[in-house]
Amino acid sequence: MAKGDPKKPKGKMSAYAFFVQTCREEHKKKNPEVPVNFAEFSKKCSERWKTMSSKEKSKFDEMAKADKVRYDREMKDYGPAKGGKKKKDPNAPKRPPSGFFLFCSEFRPKIKSTNPGISIGDVAKKLGEMWNNLSDNEKQPYVTKAAKLKEKYEKDVADYKSKGKFDGAKGPAKVARKKVEEEEEEEEEEEEEEEEEEDE
């Protein structure tokens, strides 16, 4: 069982694990009053397993295969409920950028064009250095614009909540939404890198 999640399926067992389990059950039946010395017991099981033929092991191999099927099926059922990364509603208002992100949006393409093949991390580092070298007056236009976008975002969120969630468009719109989501995720990856640079 996984810690903190009692609903997570029990892990799949190997053929050897089934063999050890069987040995333990046999020991309990033959010696119900004798406690198991796990170190000694494990050693005996290991030695016995090594001397067994493939035919003798086949029963445990089959048990392991059946358990893998059980595990895969349960994990498939468990997966969607687990949640993972929550799917975004494409109609939900996108969080507004900070002044630093607006600055990054303006200068990121310039850095990429002058440094072909530069990594996201290095772009973020350069942008962070450039931002930190700006005076408060130079930063002000970006900060002011960010504040206005935040006001608009808060209004849009209120409107969005009052109207309820989207009704789920079908067909080509879904494909377009997927492309937008992928582009947004790529942008967010760059923004996360840049956010780290801003905090340094």
Curated annotation (Swiss-Prot):
Chain spans, region Disordered: 71-97, 161-200
Residues that bear Cysteine sulfonic acid (-SO3H): 23, 45, 104
UniProt-recorded Gene Ontology molecular function terms: DNA binding; DNA binding, bending; four-way junction DNA binding; RNA binding
SS bonds (residue pairs): 23-45
Keyword Transcription recorded: yes
Residue list for modification N6-acetyllysine: 3, 30, 43, 112, 139
Major localization listed first in the record, in broad terms: nucleus
Keywords for this protein: Acetylation, Chromosome, Cytoplasm, Disulfide bond, DNA-binding, Immunity, Innate immunity, Nucleus, Oxidation, Phosphoprotein, Repeat, Transcription, Transcription regulation
InterPro entries assigned: HMG_box_dom, HMG_box_dom_sf, HMG_boxA_CS, HMGB
GO biological process, one term: innate immune response
Post-translational modification: Reduction/oxidation of cysteine residues Cys-23, Cys-45 and Cys-104 and a possible intramolecular disulfide bond involving Cys-23 and Cys-45 give rise to different redox forms with specific functional activities in various cellular compartments: 1- fully reduced HMGB3 (HMGB3C23hC45hC104h), 2- disulfide HMGB3 (HMGB3C23-C45C104h) and 3- sulfonyl HMGB3 (HMGB3C23soC45soC104so).
Free-text tissue specificity from the UniProt record: Expressed in bone marrow cells, specifically in primitive Lin-, c-kit+, Sca-1+, IL-7Ralpha- cells, and Ter119+ erythroid cells.
Role, per record: Multifunctional protein with various roles in different cellular compartments. May act in a redox sensitive manner. Associates with chromatin and binds DNA with a preference for non-canonical DNA structures such as single-stranded DNA. Can bend DNA and enhance DNA flexibility by looping thus providing a mechanism to promote activities on various gene promoters. Proposed to be involved in the innate immune response to nucleic acids by acting as a cytoplasmic promiscuous immunogenic DNA/RNA sensor. Negatively regulates B-cell and myeloid cell differentiation.
Protein name: High mobility group protein B3
Natural source organism: Mus musculus (Mouse)
Gene: Hmgb3
